[in-house]
């Protein structure tokens, strides 16, 4: 299975000027309830970047621009292997409407460990924390 994961790095700031990251709580399947960065599967003929844009529009009714690749994560779950390309992304327009997720949060670097991440996302969380101001 090829997966595309995008990380929304929104440049909204708090009073302190901290960058914040958008995370969602999975609302379906065996991994329901775990926290992840929104994204989804690549369809035949799609690039990872195009898949991210499509998935975010479908799942969150939001248009994004896809930026730099953070990393490609390989993870073996008990029933499948996940390969996911992780990108920095920014919102172009939309209000991040939750269509498939149970909940969502904007997280600062300090709050990244406040949710229970899905196993495949834990590695990328560390890389994101290193990159944030």
Model-predicted regions and their roles:
Residues 20, 31-33, 38, 62-65, ...:
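A generic structural signal for short beta-strands and their flanking turns/coil linkers
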Residues 30, 97-133:
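Nudix hydrolase/Nudix homology domain
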Residues 48, 52-57, 69, 87, ...:
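Hydrophobic packing within well-folded, soluble alpha/beta domains
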Residues 40, 54-55, 67, 102, ...:
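Structural detector for helix-capping/boundary residues
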Residues 1-21:
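Conserved N-terminal beta-strand and adjoining loop/helix that marks the start
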Residues 10, 63-65, 72-95, 103-105, ...:
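Active-site-adjacent beta-strand/loop module that shapes the phosphate/pyrophosphate-binding cleft
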Residues 19-58:
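Conserved Nudix-box catalytic region and its N-terminal flanking loop in Nudix hydrolases
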